[in-house]
Amino acid sequence: MSLREFRKAGHPPTLAAAFLYFDVSFMVWVLLGPLAPFLAESLKLTATQKGVLTAIPLLGGSFFRPILGWMTERYGGRRTGLIGLSVSLIPLALGWQLANTYGQFLALGLLLGVAGASFAAALPLASGWYPPEHQGLAMGIAGAGNSGTLLATLFAPRLAQALGWHSVFGIAMVPVCLVWIAFFLMAKDAPGARVTKQWKDYASILKEADSWWFCFIYSITFGGFVGLASYLSVFFHDQYHLTKVQAGDFTTVVVLFGSFLRPVGGMLADRLGGYRMLLVLLTGIAVCLAGVAMLPPAMAALGLLAGAMAMMGMGNGSVFQLVPQRFVGRVGILTGVVGAAGGFGGFLLPSALGAIKDRTGTFGLGFAVLAFVALAGAGALLGIGRIWRSQWDAESARRAGLYTGGEACEGYAAAE
């Protein structure tokens, strides 16, 4: 696959629009994370409360993602994206003008989940323009919009320190409005009749065991990425006593690796197979998080977390290289379901780290638990791969990278 072939295969303006939509939505979705040290100081929050505060938008994202997935199937990704961007302005306006208590911020955080639900519209919008052999890179580029997290972690602490945290919410409305205009002008739904799904279709897809495996793996890769992106400002500030701005900068460095390596993960998954990639990546994530569990010096923790996030980002691209191979014609629905699982995994991560910190006085045990979950994911994937090899058609199995060694030759022959 060459980049020239990739450009000719789809619709670059729509791919760019999907990226921008996802990017600014991610910025909004995780905004409470880099602001958490400021809010915790102002509201006198415990470690558990800080964990829940940074996690609640992720729970909101889990709730709204199936809804936006259904809307994408029914109304198209373009219209759904415009609605999502419009609704995302509401919690920003509330944070700017009204929110002053912990309870109000929890309600605001749930509404921020609409921005997190952008996943269910942006990825099918981009995916619809590209054939299966280009899905990994297309989904990776659109999904690299999770780099919007960088905008939040880099600028939100500085703006909060200079202008007050209320102002940050108002300022964030500006890029949302600009992206709305760009999305309106650039995005275009892929040709072809849309097949409208009913809520029973979501229930039906959940009856298939493979959908649960995708949910579990994605809750580790994407859930780990967004959960850490939202919580690391608190971790660096509380564990290493960095200033609020320094904690945001450390988080920015970590998120940088995960965001921009997502397309690389998609590209490698197109060539090597998403299954093969995930086996390596999940194991690597477990090793890095186990290192963080030892609470090494700040710079060592920074390097280990950057490594973990890089592999989580590549894992996100790899998961969605697998989805079209297994669920042909149902990418929109499964994207919503799997995305919801990823968001829920992200919600559990900060909540668990905060609660464990309150009960044990250390972050170490929390990161050890995360390492174990990642390793369990690799083990589960290794086992389910044997079943997939016997159930999937030869061409899909070949693209997924389910064949190894001599099996690869047999798989290629069967596909031909």
Summary of predicted features, one role per range:
Residues V30, L58-P66, A117, T149-L151, ...:
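Residue-level signature of mid-helix packing/kink "hotspots" within the transmembrane helices
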Residues F63-T101, A269, Y275:
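Conserved MFS/SLC helix-loop-helix module at the cytosolic interface between two early adjacent transmembrane helices
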